[in-house]
Design a protein with these regions (language model features):
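N-terminal beta-alpha lobe that positions the nucleotide/phosphoryl donor
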Residues: 1-264, 268-291
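Short, well-ordered beta-strand elements within core beta-sheets of diverse protein domains
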Residues: 156-158, 233-237, 387-396, 411, ...
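Catalytic cores of soluble metabolic enzymes centered on carboxylation/carboxyl-transfer
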Residues: 292-295, 300-524, 643-653, 659, ...
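C-terminal amphipathic alpha-helical interaction region
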Residues: 543, 563-564, 604, 612
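Catalytic P-loop NTP-binding/switch module of NTPases
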Residues: 548, 554-592
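Structured functional modules or segments
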Residues: 579-665
Length: 665
């Protein structure tokens, strides 16, 4: 019997496994690297072992040594990292430890997407034909380049022009090597408006194979899921599709002697004349990021069942029937409006008001579950995936589940990093999503710019700026030693106004001019706003109709976050007397995020053209290309391969030939 479990992972999945282990009375062991030293999963474990290097979550020997040192008798791989590495699974078993996962042969069979598709085809599971990167023709475009190992959108590229194929294959190979330790890639036909539908399977070592339920994960960015749900709206509307999917999934699991939790992923088509067709993509021989939606609709604890199967227990003949609807939103530290740029830094505050459960099912009661890898004060590193948390809803109907989740995200208190929160809320409230029209081209169809729009309109931003100014005044008043009883900004000369200026995330400037008189607040602008009350962290304002709204205000240096029922607002304080500083030279290439320079595409003195790739950055295991802003000459190059850079650093300068000629004359 398992008694102490080491989780060979980090973040929210480590916390998720620990939660079940604690409920079952099992000991827990965390491994961590230096960037994760203060992470929540480390603090919550009964024992913790430090790994020497930032990439040691991929070091099988180090993890097994940690298990032995901490007295663990089982290893749970989580997902990502080594979770689908057959050699790691074999090494765990050879070390005399229990592997909380499928048999080694099953992991190996599914570890290569190339070989697994051949195996599934021979077993009678429908598959898309594989294409060799060297044999793709113009007629076969568009194609999808995919890493043979791993997942999560890494090592994946869509290619629409044959001339771009070689470069995209090379980039996918580098990403795959960095993320999974295996650079092998292949190509397959790309369906631009397909549906990503998957089946959760669970099998024991006694011949029972469950198809627990399906999920749809078609809302994706960079081929990585961001909204997942159960059941699938596509499957719900096509008669007979669920039974065929379940049969194919059970067939896939049985063909490789599977045991434990796994997911069989399919690409489904609903174009005219092909409705309900589906093709095997891959089998993930591990727990999925999106497993909570299956737990919510079935009432199962999939981690508990993984542990039970690892202990040799039998499953019931049939799984429980699914009920209701569950949707999961992945909260990422990234900026969708600017190329999905990952963000890194300090999380000042994080709270999802009204969440009723953490890392556990809601008991099929309408509400919100939170599976988070962060808490107040967490630091998001450039070294790992930018997912901060998963916010999950459950409700009797899909529409209610979507609206409950959107409301919870909109009310979430999240200070310190730019995230995809606005995108998630706008998608969940979009009529097309509510109607179930959710294919993989959702962002292209409905416009990423519109879907990334702020949740708060201009009027709310203006009110939030007023609230921020008055909260600052209350803060100053509280600090005043002599005139602490007087309103901040009160003057014997009543004509004087206090001024506070902010910029919002759209670079709009908000100048707030106010003064306090013996009769109350006066604003210089013609704004029908009344002050009900003010404190350093809370201001209540009323509009012309007397409707009051509470604004919670938090300031961290020059960053101000204002949360209200009308929407979240982030502001920056504009100093009254800006410090003199050097401006960035024209043609400068500025790092849009912190990261590591992994490749350079030109040398100083080279002529470059608009859009030409010049510098490749790696951040959070994804490549990001910095291109030339205009035709010109690379005048300076301030970085070298392997160098780590901070956001805002000037990497290089491209100068147009005329400017260079003037400078030389």
């Amino acid at each position: 019997m398992v008694s102490r479990v080491l989780v060979a992972n980090r973040g929210e999945i480590a916390r998720r496994v620990f939660a079940t282990c604690r409920r079952l009375g099992l000991g827990t062991v965390a491994v961590y690297t230096e960037p994760d030293a203060a992470a929540p999963h480390v603090a919550e474990a009964d024992a913790r072992v430090r790994l020497a290097k930032t990439n040691d979550y991929l070091n099988a020997e180090a993890i097994i040594a940690a298990a032995r040192a901490a007295g663990a008798d089982a290893i749970h791989p989580g997902y990502g990292f080594l979770s689908e590495n057959a050699d790691f699974a074999a090494a765990v078993a050879d070390a005399g430890l229990t592997w909380v996962g499928p048999p080694v042969d099953a992991v190996r069979a599914m570890g290569s997407k190339i070989e697994s598709k051949k195996l599934m085809a021979s077993a009678g599971v429908p598959v898309l034909d594989e294409l060799g990167p060297d044999s793709v023709t113009q007629a076969q475009l568009p194609v999808l380049v995919k890493a043979s190992a791993g997942g999560g959108g890494r090592g994946m590229r869509v290619v629409r022009e044959l001339s771009a194929l070689a470069g995209e294959v090379a980039a996918a190979q580098r990403e795959a090597q960095s993320a999974f330790g295996d650079p092998t890639v292949f190509c397959e036909r790309y369906l631009p408006t397909g549906h990503h539908v998957e089946v959760q399977v669970l099998a024991d070592n006694h011949g029972t194979v469950w198809a627990v339920g399906e999920r749809e994960c078609s809302i994706q960015r960079r081929h990585q899921k961001i909204i997942e749900e159960a059941p699938s709206p596509l499957v719900e509307r096509i008669p007979g599709m669920r039974a065929k999917l379940f049969d194919a999934a059970r067939l896939a699991a049985s063909a490789i002697g599977y045991a434990g939790a796994g997911t069989v992923e399919f690409l489904a088509d609903d174009s005219p004349g092909r409705e309900g067709e589906f093709f095997f993509l891959e089998m993930n021989t591990r727990l999925q990021v999106e497993h909570p939606v299956t737990e919510e609709t079935t009432g199962l604890d999939l981690v508990e069942l993984q542990l039970a199967v690892a202990d040799g227990e039998r499953l019931d003949v049939e799984p429980p029937a699914a009920q209701g609807h569950s949707i999961e939103a992945r909260l990422y530290a990234e900026d969708p409006a600017h190329g999905w740029q990952p963000q890194a830094g300090l999380v000042h505050a994080f709270d999802v008001p009204g969440s009723r459960a953490e890392f556990a099912a809601l008991g099929q009661r309408t509400g919100i579950r939170l599976d988070s890898g962060i808490v107040d004060g967490s630091v998001v590193s450039i070294h790992y995936d930018p997912m901060l948390a998963k916010v999950i809803s459950y409700a009797p109907t899909r529409r209610l589940a979507a609206l409950v989740l959107a409301d919870a995200l909109a009310r979430t208190r999240l200070h310190g990093l730019r995230t995809n929160r606005e995108l998630l809320v706008n998608v969940l409230r979009h009529q097309a999503f509510l109607d179930g029209a959710t294919d993989t081209a959702f962002f292209d169809t409905h416009g990423l710019a519109q879907l990334s729009a702020p949740l708060s309109d201009e009027g709310v931003v203006r009110l939030s700026a007023i609230a921020a100014a008055l909260a600052d005044a209350a803060h100053n008043r509280a600090r005043a030693a002599v005139f602490g009883s007087l309103p901040s900004g009160w003057r014997n000369l009543t004509s004087g106004y206090q001024v506070k200026t902010f910029t919002d995330d759209q670079n709009n400037k908000h100048r707030i001019e106010y003064r306090f008189t013996r009769t109350g607040l006066v604003l210089a602008a013609d704004e029908a706003v009344q002050l009900v009350s003010s404190a350093p962290d809370e201001v209540v304002l009323a509009d012309a109709n007397g409707v009051a709204c509470r604004f919670a205000v938090a300031r961290y240096g020059d960053d101000v976050y204002v949360d209200s029922a009308r929407g979240p607002v982030h502001l920056n304080v504009v100093p009254r007397f800006p410090e003199p500083g050097s401006s960035v030279a024209k043609g400068s290439l500025v790092a849009p995020m912190p990261g590591n320079v992994i490749r350079l595409g030109a040398q100083v003195g080279d002529s470059v053209t608009t859009g030409q790739p010049l510098i490749w950055l790696e951040a959070m295991k994804m490549e990001h290309t910095i291109t030339a802003p205009a035709d010109g000459v690379l005048r300076s190059l301030n970085v070298t391969t392997g160098q780590q850079v901070e956001v805002g650093a000037v990497l290089a300068i491209v100068e147009d030939p005329e400017s260079q000629a003037k400078g030389d004359s």
